């Protein structure tokens, strides 16, 4: 399916800015808690290699994005096997069970989001005479946007849009007073692509989601929505502008409000090393509770920042050493139904992305 592009003219752009402008950015709403540092522990649940985790699944290769609904299992983008796999567990320590595997047309999925199917008029998937609102939406390094509805095709997502020479590394669902939009991080072209609720790519003014102060050679690596704010992580491009260059200090994070026009630098260099995952620390994480957590793919560390971007330190194990997960990609808060509210799900492309690991990070057991 060829990309459809709609230009937002000056008057509509102005309306968008006014409609979403408001109080301070959402990251100001996350209050820092001054408790003692909480040590964390990593629990491996699923891996493609036998003996690494309690459950073995050969389809779990280089898992990137994670998503889930309030009561759904966790969905995982398996970049190395061109599928998304779905896993269910509880908080009582029972083994993980695999609920489903869904093919991703175009392959190499990266980011993904959950879409509430009760929002019936938006993000509608149609194929072979069947239609329904997407439950999960994916992007990929092939430049494809795909969406899944179980009544349309339970075994495969459907291609709904295609970016122009795009290499999408991350995806976010952004709900605004003017409707819902998809934000896709195009690492190759160095931009955030915006899609409306009919999967039409919008030709945004160049000032939207743009940081002119970035050094040359950096591009959006991932995008996340927290409250009303949009966080964009940036990594250094390789010569082909397809993959990131890892290294200490190679990374930035910006936070955007006012429909992408107002930008603040949230974090620069320092502990950042190809930052990808962005999420909020659970209340169980001691002094880091409510902080913004940024996961580095480059060194596998998870760094905590307060609501103004002040570096608080890395998550550490009970031995006092920074937790480092080889090939770290996604981080996702657990729920009471799946994983537990005290924990974070993590996904990692271990062994230089040749294999995969899924598990939980939570407070260390004393």
Model-identified regions with their sequence ranges:
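Secretory targeting and sorting signals
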Residues: 1-26
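Sequence/structural signature of beta-propeller domains
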Residues: 24-366
């Amino acid at each position: 399916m060829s990309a459809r592009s709609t230009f937002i003219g000056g008057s509509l752009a102005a309306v968008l800015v006014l409609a979403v402008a408001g109080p301070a950015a959402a990251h100001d709403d996350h209050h820092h808690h001054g408790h003692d540092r909480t040590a964390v522990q990593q629990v491996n649940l699923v891996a493609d290699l036998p003996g690494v985790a309690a459950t073995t699944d050969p389809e779990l290769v280089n898992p990137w994005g994670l998503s889930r609904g309030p009561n759904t299992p966790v969905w995982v983008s398996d970049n190395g096997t061109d599928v998304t796999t779905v896993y269910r567990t509880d908080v009582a320590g029972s083994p993980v069970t695999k609920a489903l595997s869904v093919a991703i047309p175009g392959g190499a999925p990266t980011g993904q989001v959950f879409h509430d199917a009760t929002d019936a008029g938006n993000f509608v998937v149609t194929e072979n005479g069947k239609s329904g609102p997407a439950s999960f939406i994916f992007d990929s390094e092939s430049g494809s946007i795909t969406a899944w509805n179980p009544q349309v095709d339970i075994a495969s997502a459907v291609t709904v849009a295609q970016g122009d020479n795009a290499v999408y590394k991350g995806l976010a669902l952004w709900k605004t007073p003017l409707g819902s939009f998809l934000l896709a991080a195009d690492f190759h072209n160095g931009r955030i692509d915006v899609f409306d609720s009919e999967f039409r790519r919008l030709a945004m003014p160049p000032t939207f989601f743009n940081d002119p102060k970035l050094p040359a050679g950096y591009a959006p690596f991932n995008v996340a929505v927290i409250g009303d704010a949009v966080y964009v992580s940036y990594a250094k491009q390789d010569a082909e502008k397809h993959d990131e260059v890892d290294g200490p200090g190679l990374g930035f994070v910006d936070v955007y409000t006012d429909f992408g026009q107002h930008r603040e630098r949230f974090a620069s260099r320092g502990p950042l090393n190809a930052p990808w995952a962005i999420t909020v620390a659970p209340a169980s994480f001691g002094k880091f509770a409510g902080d913004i957590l940024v996961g580095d793919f480059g060194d596998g560390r998870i760094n905590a920042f307060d609501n103004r971007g002040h570096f608080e330190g890395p998550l550490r194990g009970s031995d006092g050493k920074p937790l480092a997960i080889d090939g770290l990609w996604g981080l996702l808060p657990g729920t009471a139904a799946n994983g537990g509210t005290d924990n974070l799900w993590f996904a990692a492309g271990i062994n230089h992305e040749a294999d995969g690991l899924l598990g939980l990070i939570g407070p260390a057991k004393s």
